[in-house]
UniProtKB/Swiss-Prot annotation:
E.C. no: 1.2.1.10
UniProt GO molecular function: acetaldehyde dehydrogenase (acetylating) activity; NAD binding
Protein name: Acetaldehyde dehydrogenase
UniProt xrefs under HAMAP family: Ac_ald_DH_ac (MF_01657)
Binding site for NAD(+): S12, G13, N14, I15, S158, A159, G160, P161, G162, T163, R164, A165, N166, N277
Keyword hit for Lipid biosynthesis: no
Keyword terms: Aromatic hydrocarbons catabolism, NAD, Oxidoreductase
List of catalytic residues: C127
Species per Swiss-Prot/TrEMBL record: Mycolicibacterium gilvum (strain PYR-GCK) (Mycobacterium gilvum (strain PYR-GCK))
Catalysed reaction, written as an equation: acetaldehyde + NAD(+) + CoA = acetyl-CoA + NADH + H(+)
A Pfam family annotated for this UniProt entry: AcetDehyd-dimer
InterPro entries per the UniProt record, alphabetical: Acetaldehyde_dehydrogenase (IPR003361), Acetylaldehyde_DH_C (IPR015426), NAD(P)-bd_dom_sf (IPR036291), Semialdehyde_DH_NAD-bd (IPR000534)
Family statement drawn from the similarity comment of this UniProt entry: Belongs to the acetaldehyde dehydrogenase family.
GO biological process, one term: catabolic process
Length: 306
């Protein structure tokens, strides 16, 4: 087994803390540092107890060190990452961005991870994107998708102030991902914050317009194959029932339609299981980081043999 890549987590909130627990299980990545700005942060306290070096002095502290990480996962805010990203690049640190900054290409593991393994900075799109774009991709790789619409319903309890402040950005970024990554010619995204108590787990509905002569069996199989792929890093990702095919009607805009229903239950590492919307972000980020590390080791090995 090759040496693990050293990792710093920038941000010490709920997402960063959940990500930490996932990275501690990784065979390819070694979390060494957690950076925040609040000295009383529970995330920093937990990281210290788990043996990480921590600081509340932000990115300046990390980049001033003689030993720098191979990779950084950033779960702060878009404006913080926009400032820090050029500095990571200058220091030769690979960046995985869990904010809406979207400086690097958006990555949805089942759809386009292999295309961006050498990118210096990759963006994890949005939680709704991670849950629904794989399904749009599953359909669009079989048939043309002129229009796709996703509706992400998440527990209000799992949506913090950052999510609430960025609802418009969420819909814009996710809609773009449905098109650019999912493969739909036109995309739309809707998010619903459900105030139900006890909190409900994340549920998503994906509508794709399809040709009249679409092969329903091939689409269904493609959907199931992609669900299985997502389950390799998010075991709680599942179809609620078989894809539903509908004839054109006034309700669906006169399109032949396939509708896919999924739910996402979190692993409960740090965040509660109902917060599948946050869990799929951290799990996907860990997956991307591990694949980048695996590719780097493979490239190094090939170079050494040559």
């Amino acid at each position: 087994m090759a040496d693990k890549l050293s990792v710093a987590i920038v941000g010490s909130g709920n997402i960063s803390t959940d990500l930490l627990y996932k990275l501690l299980r990784s065979e390819w990545l070694e979390p060494r540092w957690m950076i925040g700005i609040d000295p009383e942060s529970e995330g920093l306290a937990r990281a210290r107890k788990l043996g990480l070096e921590t600081s509340h002095e932000g990115v300046d502290w990390l980049l001033a060190r003689d030993e720098k990480p191979d990779m950084v996962f950033e779960a702060t805010s878009a404006y913080v990452h926009r400032d820090a990203a050029p500095r990571y690049a200058e220091a030769g640190i690979r960046a995985i961005d869990l904010t809406p900054a979207a400086i690097g290409p958006g990555v949805i593991p089942p759809a386009n991870l292999r295309e961006h393994l050498d990118a210096p900075n990759v963006n994890m799109v949005t939680c709704g994107g991670q849950a629904t774009i794989p399904m749009v991709h599953a359909v669009s790789r079989v048939v043309d998708v002129p229009y796709a619409e996703i509706v992400a319903s998440v527990s209000s309890a799992s949506a913090g102030p950052g999510t609430r402040a960025n609802i418009d950005e969420f819909t814009k970024t996710t809609s773009a991902g449905v098109e650019v990554i999912g493969g739909a010619r036109r995309g739309k995204a809707i998010i619903i914050l459900n105030p139900a108590d006890p909190p409900m787990i994340m549920r998503d509905t994906i509508f794709c317009a399809i040709p009249e002569d679409a092969d329903h069996a091939a689409i269904t199989q493609s959907v199931k194959d992609v669900v299985a792929e997502v389950q390799t890093y998010v075991p709680g990702y599942r179809l609620l029932n078989e894809p539903q095919f509908d004839e054109p009607s006034v309700v669906n805009g006169g399109n032949h339609l396939v509708t896919i229903f999924v739910e996402v239950e979190g692993a409960g590492d740090y965040l509660p299981p109902y917060a599948g919307n946050l869990d799929i972000m951290t799990a996907a980020a860990a997956k991307v980081g591990e694949e980048i590390a695996r590719e780097r080791v493979a490239t190094s090995t090939t170079g050494a043999q040559a």
